[in-house]
Amino acid sequence: MSLSSRLCLLTIVALILPSRGQTPKKPTSIFTADQTSATTRDNVPDPDQTSPGVQTTPLIWTREEATGSQTAAQTETQQLTKMATSNPVSDPGPHTSSKKGTPAVSRIEPLSPSKNFMPPSYIEHPLDSNENNPFYYDDTTLRKRGLLVAAVLFITGIIILTSGKCRQLSQFCLNRHR
């Protein structure tokens, strides 16, 4: 069996085998919601603590809850900046402009979204409707397959390039000795 046929066979086996009946046991998300800053509808118990037969519903955010957590983060940031500006030793006071008509520079930085805030568009949808769909793949599976294909193509390209040069080099060496 030649090297290229072995590589093709390995590629086909590597792409087909992982997709046969393997589903993630517990879907995980890249983004996690901070339970202390987000408003939830109910206290949902941890799935590990409930009985294995009972399925819990996923946390679904509405626009009101998302904006509510944003306003909570804004008020928390405002309270922190008030506490920081109340210290007379470290705060020299607001900067006033020497030119007339120019407003004073504010020391409060614009509010950026917190690290733990998850916008509603990133929430994973329940897998119930997609479980029976054979063409459905989650992001982690697609990422792994993409990396596998890229690695195989990269190695194949290196083999093709080096084998061609080695062939040319060996012919060059054989012709030189004649």
UniProtKB/Swiss-Prot annotation:
Residues 1-21 form the signal peptide. It is found in: Cell membrane; Basolateral cell membrane. Residues 67-79 have a biased composition (Low complexity). Residues 167-178 are cytoplasmic. It comes from the Eukaryota. Keywords: Cell membrane, Glycoprotein, Ion transport, Membrane, Potassium, Potassium transport, Signal, Sodium, Sodium transport, Sodium/potassium transport, Transmembrane, Transmembrane helix, Transport. This is FXYD domain-containing ion transport regulator 5. It comes from Mus musculus (Mouse). The gene is Fxyd5.
